[in-house]
Regions:
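Mg2+/Mn2+-dependent nuclease catalytic core
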Residues: 65-160
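Conserved RecA-like P-loop NTPase helicase motor core
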Residues: 575-587, 640-752
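Walker A/P-loop
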Residues: 212-234
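Conserved pre-motif I regulatory segment
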Residues: 177-220
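A contiguous, basic/glycine-rich beta-loop/short-helix subdomain that forms a polymer-engagement track
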Residues: 327-352, 363-370, 462-578, 587-588, ...
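Metal-dependent nuclease catalytic cores that hydrolyze phosphodiester bonds in DNA/RNA
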Residues: 1-88
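A substrate-engagement module of RecA-like helicase motors
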Residues: 184, 191, 243-352, 360, ...
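Signature of the SF2 helicase/ATPase Hel1-core->accessory helical subdomain module
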Residues: 231, 258, 332-351, 355-458, ...
Length: 791
């Protein structure tokens, strides 16, 4: 094979050294190390040190090296923090900002030294130099104290060491090469597994085109069009064309992860050779009742890194769809941590199915793909993308409570005077803020508090490192991570954040760094890949989601038509009821109950009723419980607060197609049953939606409204109406899941008759009937009579 035609496999320096050099136990009691480095590379400390180093110091130098093999090449690349190339010799500088007291750091952390040695070898190789001084610069985040370690390495030693490093990686590279050839051959022959539904092919073409142009795409596609396969298939085809080398399928809920797994299986049955792993939360994978990732508490942590390579190598050669159950089987066989095994497998598969937070959350995201300076040929599919707005705000915000400082002080009062003193300093500043806060208060700056918290973080890190068996270590560790996240978030503050304090209803005093517009933070992650497709059945208005998910109103957008016969669905809007707070009274609750009785009485079947709150639900339930007509017409069951998985499954089991009586489920709008519930083929024939779904007026919503008003936009729409309407459309989407289904959607609130609400209706809602309590039965009777004729 000609050298020019060789396939290039890419690997980052960081991932290479972390993968090859790890050994021994898994131990999360250590708070220092490569994975705990404060702020990651490229932080404020890096820039500050780099600016101090003078004219000879070149910062952020991109270095690459190609390793030639018979059939392929390995491109290993990274970014050196600093290069000092003087006539008297070369120095490679690797900077790490850490919280721990530098007195406890007696030698460089091995993986950091290995990274710097790689850069030293690359630079010497490219510039024909005889060797380099490898320098590790550690800087305490709070004090800015610096400790440097230097070791001189001749080129021959660097070369021999690097060859040994690469030798350990070659068998894995061969796997990637051979697997990639077989995968791409299968993709070229792959056809769409079913006849295309109306609009489905256009959707697939739009996805492929956007990926070919390395653009992002927003898709509004109603239920039933087959969004998962319509986005997966063209994405896989794009990978076969070399437009990406790893596909991330991102979801907000477990149920949609299952749909993605099933869709990949369908394509494999059609000949696709493509392996995937589903990343599951640590708590759901751990063999222990409570995860304790250290060799003293968990036998799977002891010697984990000595065995995990063999486990990964076997699983990627034997399995294609690597689910939670598969992970657990191999983890038991090889005696390794199932969660860490799962993360390692992600390096070697074609597709990763995971929750949003593994890509976006700065505390949880997969650093092997998304750390500073690391990018790749990634393709992102963001399922149920409407959820990413609120999830994004949550992931990029930070909260601390004053009371937690007092709790930790109580735990450490007789143990560590230095920490107690810092806790007092922080508490004093929070107390000052509390005195100035009536209900809530917006703040401009909290620099003094952050400085104190940074000192506290450093001391807590020292304490945790030394006191690994402290009785309340878990509480202190959680507090440490909370503070670290606050500092991390503080360093990201820009015009898209608001800082505020609030006296909570439970008596606690809260400080929050609130990310009101997450677009910039989300884009920072997505820009590490080639293309992103956001899709949902409720992505309206699309301009709202463009602004808050990517920040670019010029992104591509597609509106897919509904594939279903509109005659099988009736949409009614009630003009004589409303869930406005001023209208929440006994008379209104009774009217809602009367609507339910009239709606259900016209056709036996299963119905879901979505109410504005638990309180509202209980009011309606109390009326139904004593209404004789209701008792004769249907059986009902109410959603409870904090239902576990088994209770939810039991609730959904009530929706049988062959019930002898009608069944009504009373649910809360925006709750667990509002989306991701697939009750098809006669299991649900009606969704009754009470109210417009507006979020409750609270501090967060008030701040959101103020932020968008300040930007000259419609603050009420952004903070209340759009999120509310999304909940309405999600609830309505529970009805009619297949072309065999039929049913009704009842919008019980007069506000839906206003033009600003109707402007937000999806296209398939064209044509609705306005009803009152005394006319609704006639409209329903006509609809069901026509449906019987249609049968």
């Amino acid at each position: 094979m000609d050298v020019e035609e060789k396939k290039i496999l890419k690997m980052s320096v960081r991932n290479l050294v972390e993968f090859v050099l790890r050994s021994g136990d898994l131990d999360n009691r250590r708070t220092s190390g490569a994975e705990k480095t404060a702020m990651q590379e490229g932080s404020r400390i890096h820039r500050k040190i780099q600016r101090r180093m003078g004219a000879d110091y070149k910062a952020e130098v991109v270095l690459k090296h190609i390793v030639e093999e018979d059939q392929f090449k390995i491109l290993i690349e990274g970014r050196a923090d600093g290069v000092i190339d003087k006539p008297e010799g070369l120095t490679i500088d690797e900077i790490k900002g850490i919280y721990m007291d530098l007195d406890y750091l007696t030698e460089p952390i091995p993986v950091h030294l290995a990274q710097a040695m790689c850069y030293g070898y690359f630079y010497c190789y490219d510039h024909h130099l005889n060797g380099a001084v490898i320098q590790l610069t550690y800087c305490n985040i709070e004090t800015e104290e610096i400790r440097r370690f230097q070791v001189e390495k001749p080129f021959e030693e660097l070369e021999l060491w690097f060859q040994g490093l690469v030798h350990e990686y070659i068998k894995w590279a061969r796997y990637l090469y051979n697997h990639g050839i077989r995968r791409d051959e299968s993709i070229w022959d792959l056809e769409f597994p079913y006849p295309y539904r109306a609009g489905q092919k256009d959707l697939a073409v739009a996805v492929f085109r956007s990926m070919k142009r390395k653009r992002n795409l927003f898709i509004q596609a109603p239920t039933g069009i087959g969004k998962t396969l319509s986005t997966l298939y063209p994405s896989i085809k794009a990978m076969g064309e070399g437009l990406g080398d790893k596909l991330f399928y991102l979801t907000a809920k477990t149920i949609t992860r299952s749909v993605a797994e099933e869709s990949f299986d369908i394509l494999r049955e059609k000949g696709l050779y493509f392996n995937t792993v589903t990343i599951t939360a640590k708590e759901k994978l751990c063999f222990l009742d409570t995860p304790e990732c250290n060799p003293d508490a968990c036998p799977y942590a002891k010697g984990h890194f000595d065995r995990v390579g063999d486990a990964v190598y076997e699983i990627i050669h034997k399995e294609a769809g690597i689910t939670r159950e598969v992970i657990l089987t191999y983890a038991r066989e090889f005696q390794v941590c199932p969660f860490e095994l799962c993360l390692d497998i992600s390096n070697w598969v074609d597709g990763v199915i995971c929750d949003y937070n593994y890509v976006f959350d700065p505390n949880i995201r997969l650093k092997r793909y998304f750390s500073e300076g690391i990018s790749g040929e990634y393709l992102f599919l963001v399922d149920e993308a409407h959820n990413l707005v609120s999830r994004g705000r949550e992931m990029y915000s930070a909260i601390v409570y004053k009371e937690d400082f007092l709790l930790i002080k109580k735990l450490l009062k007789s143990v560590d005077g230095k920490i107690v003193k810092l806790l007092d300093r922080c508490n004093k500043e929070l107390l000052r803020m509390k005195r100035e806060c009536e209900n809530y208060r917006l703040l401009e700056d909290i620099r003094f508090l952050i400085t104190s918290i940074m000192s506290l973080v450093g001391e807590l890190e020292r304490f945790l490192e030394v006191n690994r068996d402290f009785a309340d270590r878990d509480l202190i560790l959680l507090f440490y991570f909370t503070l670290r996240n606050l500092v991390y978030t503080y360093e990201r503050l820009d015009e898209n954040y608001r800082i505020y304090t609030e006296n909570q209803s439970d008596g606690r005093f809260m400080l929050r760094l609130f990310c009101v517009n997450p677009a910039n933070n989300l884009k920072e992650c997505l820009n590490k890949g080639n293309s992103t497709v956001f899709f949902s059945a409720t992505l309206l208005p699309v301009s709202y989601y463009k602004e808050l998910l990517s920040g670019d109103l010029d992104e591509y957008a597609v509106y897919a038509p509904s594939p279903f016969d509109q005659k099988k669905r009736l949409l009614i809007v009630a003009s004589d009821v409303s869930s406005r707070y001023t209208r929440r009274n006994q008379r209104e609750y009774e009217k809602i109950a009367s609507y339910l009785i009239k709606i259900v009485s016209k056709r036996k079947g299963n119905y879901m009723v979505f109410l504005p709150s638990y309180h509202y639900l209980k009011e309606v339930e109390s009326i139904l419980s004593v209404n004789r007509t209701a008792k004769e017409t249907f059986t009902y069951l109410s959603q409870n607060t904090h239902m576990n998985e088994q209770e939810r499954e039991a609730f959904l089991m009530e929706f049988s197609e062959h019930r002898e009586d009608s069944f009504v489920a009373l649910c809360v709008m925006g709750g667990v049953f509002s989306e991701g519930i697939d009750l098809k083929e006669g299991r649900l024939i009606g969704a009754v939606i009470v109210g417009t779904g507006l979020p409750m007026v609270c501090t967060e919503q008030v701040i959101l409204k103020g932020y968008f008003d300040e930007k000259g936009q419609k603050g009420f729409d952004y903070a209340y109406q759009y999120p509310g309407m999304n909940k309405v459309m999600q609830a309505a989407g529970r009805v009619i899941r297949t072309d065999r289904d039929e049913g009704i959607i009842a919008l019980l609130d007069e506000r839906f008759l206003k033009l600003d609400y109707q402007a937000l209706f999806p296209r398939e809602w064209d044509g609705f009937y306005e009803v009152k309590l005394n006319t609704v039965e006639n409209v329903l009777e006509d609809f069901w009579k026509n449906r019987r004729k249609g049968e």
